């Protein structure tokens, strides 16, 4: 993820 608090 780019705008999330995730890795992808």
Swiss-Prot record:
GO terms for molecular function: toxin activity. This is Toxin To31. Signal peptide: none annotated. Its main location: secreted. One of its GO terms (cellular component) is extracellular region. Expressed by the venom gland. It is found in: Secreted. The lineage of its organism: Eukaryota, Metazoa, Ecdysozoa, Arthropoda, Chelicerata. The keyword Secreted applies. The keyword Secreted applies. Keywords: Secreted, Toxin. It comes from the Eukaryota. It comes from Tityus obscurus.
């Amino acid at each position: 993820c780019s705008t999330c608090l995730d890795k992808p």
